[in-house]
């Protein structure tokens, strides 16, 4: 990984998540407000393109920390920082292990892996927030929040192929060595 380029990418993604991401949200009566998780798109891209698991896990932890800090409560509200970081690490490790079973440049592969990533990450986060929250959470509230997380996962999965193509154009700025089998000619250069 090229960490300076990755740090700039994280900053840009967090900026886009808090500005453009708000424009991409939809409100449904049955589910609530859903919007895409742009950080998840970057995490899945890295899980598909980076060779080393350690680099992918550290990058996912940083992205999850950015999501935790970006979703902090308002003045006077308590926010638990850390569950999304750990959820991103768990989800990206699962996607990294599954990537060998798929063709990474296929649109359906990207969408399905983004869906799986978001279901794991946001499902873990919703469960942790429900368990660690100060207020008592009923099963119906927990179920409604899980439905909202599933809708967010579907929405992010739909946007993943577009995000993959955009990130592929600037991959050389933050990915040093791509995943896959190395060729002798490329390794000698």
Where are these predicted regions, by residue range?
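Terminal, non-globular segments
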Residues: 1-189
């Amino acid at each position: 990984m090229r960490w300076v380029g990755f740090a700039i990418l994280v900053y840009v993604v967090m900026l886009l998540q808090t500005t453009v991401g708000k424009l991409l949200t939809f409100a449904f009566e049955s589910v609530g407000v859903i919007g895409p998780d742009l950080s998840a798109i970057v995490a899945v891209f890295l899980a598909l393109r980076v060779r080393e698991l350690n680099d992918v896990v550290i990058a996912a932890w940083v992205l999850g920390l950015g999501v935790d800090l970006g979703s902090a409560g308002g003045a006077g509200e308590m926010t638990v920082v850390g569950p999304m970081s750990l959820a991103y690490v768990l989800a990206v490790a699962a996607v990294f292990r599954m990537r060998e079973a798929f063709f990474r440049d296929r649109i359906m592969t990207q969408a399905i892996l983004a869906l799986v990533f978001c279901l794991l990450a946001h499902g873990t986060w919703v469960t942790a927030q429900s368990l660690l929250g100060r207020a008592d959470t009923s099963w119906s509230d927990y179920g409604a929040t899980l439905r909202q997380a599933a809708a967010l996962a579907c929405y992010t999965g739909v946007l993943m192929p577009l995000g993959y193509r955009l990130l592929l154009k600037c991959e050389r700025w933050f990915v040093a060595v791509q995943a896959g089998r190395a060729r002798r000619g490329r390794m000698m250069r």
